[in-house]
From Swiss-Prot:
Family listed: Belongs to the chloride channel (TC 2.A.49) family.
An example molecular function term from Gene Ontology annotations: monoatomic ion channel activity
GO-annotated cellular components: plasma membrane
Superkingdom: Bacteria
Keyword set, alphabetical order: Cell membrane, Ion channel, Ion transport, Membrane, Transmembrane, Transmembrane helix, Transport
Subcellular location, record wording: Cell membrane
Keyword Membrane among record annotations: yes
Membrane topology type: Multi-pass membrane protein
Keyword Mitochondrion in annotation: no
UniProt-listed SUPFAM superfamilies: Clc chloride channel
The protein's name in its UniProt record: Putative ion-transport protein YfeO
Transmembrane regions: 10-30, 54-74, 99-119, 120-140, 149-169, 186-206, 223-243, 258-278, 300-320, 322-342, 343-363, 371-391
Length: 418
C-alpha cells in the first residue's frame, strides 16, 4: 500500500499531466500559425510582388503595419489583450479568460511580423488563465495557486523541451518553511513540466545549443575572464533596464494603443533595416544564423547586440505582447561572439555562456534560469563549475538593482475609454 504522502502526491498527477499536455499543444498551435503567417509575410508575399524580403521599405512597412494591427487588437478586443508584459513578471496572476483571444491574436501578429519578443510571457498568461478557470470548475477544492504552479511548470517544460528548467525554478519558489518535503511539493509541477516537454518533443525539438568550439579544461584565468564578460553583459542589460520605464512612460503619454504601437513598429522597422533580417523576430533561429555566418566581424556582432537590445526595449515599451527572455539570449550570444572576436585568447564557450548568464540574469533576476539558459546554449559540462562561480559576482552586482519591468503604479489604465 502507498503511504498517505504518496497518495497525496498522486491526487494531482492526472490534472498535472493534462495541464502539461494542453500547455504544450497551445504553444505548438500558436507557433505553427505564427510560422505560416511569417512565411506569408516575409517569403511568399514579397516574392509575389517582386520585392526583396530584406528591402528597407518592406521591413519598415511590415513592422509598422504589425504595430498598427496589434494596436487595433489591444484597443478593440475584450480585455485589451491581457496585461502589458512590460509591467508583469513571467509568472503572474491569472487574467480573465475573455482577454485570451485578443492576447493570442496579438502574440501571433507580433511573432509573425518580426517583433523582437518571444512567446513565453503571453503563452504563460494564456495557460495559467485556462488552467485556473477550468480547474476551478472541475476541482473547486484545489486552490488557484496550485493551478497556477501546474500551468507555469507545464509551460516552462513545453517552451524549453525539458522539465529541468521547471525543477530549478520551482525548487526555490516552493521551498518554504512548510514541513512538507520539497520533492513532495515538486512532484505535480514536475509531472506537468515533463508532460509539456514530452508533448513538445513529439512535434519539434527546441534547438538552443550552438556549434561553439569545445571548452577543454577550466583554468583560474578563465574564471576572471568569465566574470568580466558577465559584468559587461550586466552593464549592457542595466542600460536597457534604465531605458525601459522611461520610454514606456513617454510612449504611453499618447494614450491611443494604435498610435503607440504603430510608432513602435516603425521604430522597430528602422532598427531592423540597420541590423538586417537577422536582428528581427524572437531571436532563437536568428542566433543560429548569426553563429553560422563566418563573415561577421567584431563590429557586426556589436551592432547586432546593440540593435537587438534596443529593439527589445522598444517592443516592450510600446506594449507588444511578448516575452523578453529569448531576445535577451540573442543579445548575450552576440555580445559573447563580439568579445571572443575582440580577445580571441578567451574561448568563445566562455564569452558566449557568461554573456548569456549576465544578460538573462538582468532580465529575469532568476539565477537558476540564467544558469540553465547559459548551459543549454553552450552545452559543455566543463563549463558548469565556471558558470556557478561566475554567478556569484554577477549576483552581487545586481543585488538591490531595479528589475527590467515598469513599475505597476506607473502603468497606464486600460484603453476602455480612449
Amino acid at each position: 500500500m502507498l503511504h498517505p504522502r504518496a497518495r497525496t502526491m498522486l491526487l494531482l498527477s492526472l490534472p498535472a499531466v493534462a495541464i502539461g499536455i494542453a500547455s504544450s499543444l497551445i504553444l505548438i498551435v500558436v507557433m505553427k500559425i505564427a510560422s505560416v503567417l511569417q512565411n506569408l509575410l516575409w517569403q511568399r508575399l514579397p516574392g509575389t510582388l517582386g520585392i526583396a524580403q530584406d528591402s528597407p521599405l518592406w521591413i519598415i512597412g511590415v513592422l509598422t503595419l504589425t504595430g498598427i494591427a496589434v494596436g487595433l487588437v489591444i484597443r478593440f478586443s475584450q480585455g485589451h489583450a491581457g496585461p502589458d508584459p512590460a509591467c508583469e513578471p513571467l509568472i503572474g496572476a491569472p487574467v480573465p479568460p475573455s482577454a485570451l483571444p485578443g492576447l493570442i491574436v496579438a502574440l501571433i501578429l507580433g511573432l509573425a511580423g518580426g517583433v523582437s519578443l518571444g512567446p513565453e510571457h503571453p503563452i504563460m498568461t494564456v495557460n495559467i488563465a485556462l488552467a485556473v478557470a477550468i480547474g476551478a470548475r472541475l476541482l473547486p477544492r484545489v486552490n488557484r495557486m496550485e493551478w497556477t504552479i501546474l500551468a507555469s511548470a507545464g509551460t516552462i517544460g513545453a517552451l524549453f523541451g525539458t522539465p529541468v528548467a521547471a525543477a530549478l525554478i520551482f525548487s526555490q519558489t516552493l521551498n518554504g518553511s512548510s514541513e512538507v518535503p520539497l520533492w513532495d511539493r515538486l512532484f505535480a509541477p514536475l509531472m506537468a513540466a515533463a508532460a509539456g516537454a514530452l508533448t513538445t518533443g513529439l512535434f519539434f525539438h527546441p534547438h538552443f545549443s550552438l556549434p561553439i568550439a569545445h571548452y577543454g579544461q577550466m583554468e583560474m584565468t578563465d574564471i576572471l575572464s568569465g566574470a568580466i564578460v558577465a559584468a559587461i553583459a550586466i552593464a549592457a542589460g542595466m542600460v536597457a533596464v534604465w531605458c525601459l520605464p522611461r520610454l514606456h512612460a513617454m510612449m504611453h503619454q499618447m494614450k491611443n494603443p494604435v498610435l503607440v504601437l504603430g510608432i513602435g513598429g516603425f521604430i522597430l522597422g528602422i532598427l531592423g533595416v540597420i541590423g538586417g533580417p537577422v536582428s528581427l523576430f524572437k531571436g532563437l533561429d536568428e542566433m543560429q544564423q548569426m553563429v553560422a555566418n563566418q563573415a561577421f566581424s567584431t563590429s557586426d556582432y556589436f551592432l547586432l547586440a546593440v540593435i537587438k537590445l534596443a529593439a527589445l526595449v522598444v517592443a516592450a515599451a510600446s506594449g507588444f505582447r511578448g516575452g523578453r527572455i529569448f531576445p535577451a539570449v540573442f543579445v548575450g550570444v552576440a555580445l559573447g561572439l563580439m568579445l571572443h572576436e575582440h580577445v580571441p585568447a578567451v574561448p568563445a564557450a566562455i564569452t558566449v555562456s557568461c554573456a548569456i548568464l549576465g544578460i538573462v540574469l538582468v532580465v529575469t533576476r532568476d539565477g537558476w534560469l540564467s544558469l540553465f539558459m547559459a548551459a543549454v546554449v553552450v552545452p559543455n559540462t566543463t563549463l558548469l563549475p565556471l558558470l556557478c562561480i561566475v554567478m556569484l559576482p554577477a549576483w552581487l552586482l545586481l543585488a538591490g538593482k531595479p528589475m527590467m519591468m515598469v513599475n505597476r503604479s506607473k502603468q497606464q489604465p486600460p484603453h476602455d475609454n480612449v
